[in-house]
């Protein structure tokens, strides 16, 4: 799974998308570089490193606490700090992840979100505040990779709550 995180039958689905052929070629070339013989190590103290199986070249910095609160309040005017939850944080982080993919390939943010789902990938927020796009089947394997990342860290900073990412 880690050597070829996106199976060929899913990659072939890109051919059916309404994308410029050059974009499909670039995506396929990048996906071919995705993966490693190094399996991500099981989570240690809530930390997991999926960088060896992340979509190459797709990364974005996530906002610090105040920037995140500001972005959430744009989506949810009047929300109190106490009412901020994992979903309201992920509304921001997932947008940032889809936008990073969209910017890399010159596609719409909606199309980027569709492609992430089409390829059975997921947006992963690292605990050091970055976005990675990783295989869903590895990310959701909680027996080895249950983790607390950016969402849990920000929630604790914003309102004192802490939720393991898998508990949402």
Per-region residue spans from a language model:
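Nuclease and nuclease-like effector domains acting on nucleic acids or nucleotide cofactors
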Residues: 1-122, 126-168
């Amino acid at each position: 799974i880690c050597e070829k995180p996106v199976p060929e039958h899913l990659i072939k689905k890109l051919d059916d998308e309404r994308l410029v052929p050059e974009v499909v070629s670039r995506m396929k070339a990048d996906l071919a570089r995705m993966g490693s013989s190094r399996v991500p190590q099981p989570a240690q103290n809530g930390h997991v490193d999926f960088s060896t199986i992340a979509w190459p070249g797709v990364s974005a910095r996530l906002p610090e606490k105040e920037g995140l609160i500001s972005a959430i309040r744009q989506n949810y005017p009047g929300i109190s700090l106490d009412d901020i939850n994992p979903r309201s944080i992920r509304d921001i982080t997932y947008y940032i992840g889809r936008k990073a993919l969209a910017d890399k390939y010159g596609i719409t943010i909606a199309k980027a979100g569709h492609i992430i789902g089409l390829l059975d990938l997921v947006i992963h927020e690292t605990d050091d505040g970055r976005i990675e796009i990783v295989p869903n089947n590895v990310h959701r394997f909680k027996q080895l990779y249950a983790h607390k990342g950016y969402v849990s860290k920000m929630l604790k900073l914003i309102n004192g709550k802490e939720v393991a990412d898998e508990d949402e």
